Every structure is written in structure tokens, then in C-alpha cells.
């Protein structure tokens, strides 16, 4: 009986297919293109010494890409099916030892240990997270897809012109000394 139940859970996870534009708790899910994921991590200069956190991590592509670079990475995602899919994809990519996914609310997540935040969120989400950003240690890097942090000036901006159809701008912010 236990084997049948486990088999049913695995099948349900395999049957889950995220759809771009599906409604989430605080935003719709739109995946960042693989090319822009790499551009964002390049802009943030992610190394094996980094701890990358992605709030609203979706299918885990940013976390998995950071882990492939040797960084430890954490994805915080509200949708439990997305969390399970992300864990499965991390196992398949061979980075489950460095890529962790938790079910949770991005507004309640502890981001204090991050050296890099990688985000694709709407301006209203970023505005709501701003107090958490301001509490981060100096030197922490925040890299965002397309939507900048309201009223913050990015330290660097790069637009991807190839291999990206929409939402193709990476912006980097560095937390200044206090």
C-alpha cells in the first residue's frame, strides 16, 4: 500500500507542467529565459563562494544555474508543486546537494545570509521587499529581471538582444556601506 501511495505522488509530480502566466500567490509565473538567467548570474559575478537566494523561484532555473556554477542556492516558492518540480529538476541536473527549495512566502523568508538575490518580480513586490533589501549587509548584490527596484538606481544594466524574446533586461544593485 505504501509503495502504491509513493508511486501515485511521483506520478502526480511528473504530470505537473507549469504554464507561463499561471497565477501565483503574489504574481503570475513567467519564466526567465535561460540566456537571461546566465546573463543575470554573470552580471552578479556569481562564484562558488556565493549563497544565492531566488524569491518566487518558480521552476528553479535560477537556483539550478547558480548551483551549476558551484554556488549554494536557495529557492523560496509558494506553490508546492513548483517546489517539487524544482527539486526534481535539481536532482536531474546533478546539483541537488547545492540547490535547495523550500515552500514559503517570499515576504517572510530570511534573506540575511544571501550574498546574491536573483529576482524576477513586479515593482510592487520589490517595493514591499525593500525594507529587507535595506537590512542586507554591504556588498550584497541584487540582480533583477526587467523591473527595477522602485527609486533605486542600478549599478549596472545589460539588455540581452539574442536568445531572448521578452523580459530581457538584467539590472544589478549593490547594497552600499551603512
Residue ranges and their predicted role:
Residues 72-77:
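Conserved SAM-binding motif I beta-strand of class I
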Residues 10-50, 80-113:
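S-adenosyl-L-methionine
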